[in-house]
Amino acid sequence: HVHPFYDITYLISGECTCFVNHSIYKLSRGDLIIIPPGDIHRSTFHGKIPVERFVLSFREEELNWIRSLIGDAIVSKSLKTGVISIPSKRRDYIETLLNKLLFENEGQDILSPAFIQAGLLELLLFMIRCQQYENNVYKEIDVDNQLMQEIATYIYEHYDKKITLDDMAERFHISRSYLSKKFKQATGFGFKEYLVNVRIKNACRLLLETNHSITDIAFECGFNDSNYFGDAFRRIKGIAPNKYRRNKEAI
């Protein structure tokens, strides 16, 4: 799915696989994944150990005062898509901080919003410190699913072209059924579901950044039927394309 806010997920226990845009990450204890607004993502959980996690969500505007304090470039760099493996010696610190944010989020009193803002600033500073001063904190993508990531990347970069399951199977020299099954297993998305989500993501951008007609945008994003585009857009975004364009709060 896609949403209009930042998601930071920290894994306390268990394992999961996160697919973001066109990359697959395997997360385990102490891993933190950053998902910016508009990124296509889905998580699947596996293993015998129950998954326990913190999920922190916040909107871009909540970062304004933090940007004014430590600089736009630093904040933007620290919140790019990716996974940080928090060193074991620092896990107590971040887990205590996340528990404090959870406590304040339950609305203790009129000071809670200020405590949440201060906690968010502390979390970002902690992440920046880990990124800049710790070795090997960045987690690489899952190499076991390299082929499915290549297929997802191709779709992500060529969404405006005609793309079918048969075409992709031929291009990557695998059977249609194998591609369909493995893609779903690796990403959590069905092949067509992912393709449509990528196209809608780009349609959203064009609706807000251009004055192209909705019909033109549909064709620019790979849809060959503007009615189908409208139906798909409403199904994924919960709003018609023309209303989305008029109402940026719906993003």
Predicted stretch roles:
Residues 2-18:
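Short, conserved beta-strand element in jelly-roll/cupin
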Residues 12, 95-109, 152, 156-159, ...:
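Regular secondary-structure segments
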Residues 15-17, 24, 40:
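Structural motif
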Residues 22-36:
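Short acidic-glycine-tyrosine-enriched beta hairpin
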Residues 30, 178-183, 228-229, 233:
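Short hydrophobic/aromatic patch on the recognition helix
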Residues 37-106, 125-134:
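A hydrophobic/aromatic-rich effector-binding and dimerization subdomain
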Residues 80-90, 105-116, 124-157, 161, ...:
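Short, Lys/Arg-enriched, Trp-marked, Pro/Gly-tolerant hinge/linker segments that flank
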Residues 153, 157, 162, 166, ...:
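Terminal helix-turn-helix DNA-binding modules in bacterial transcription factors
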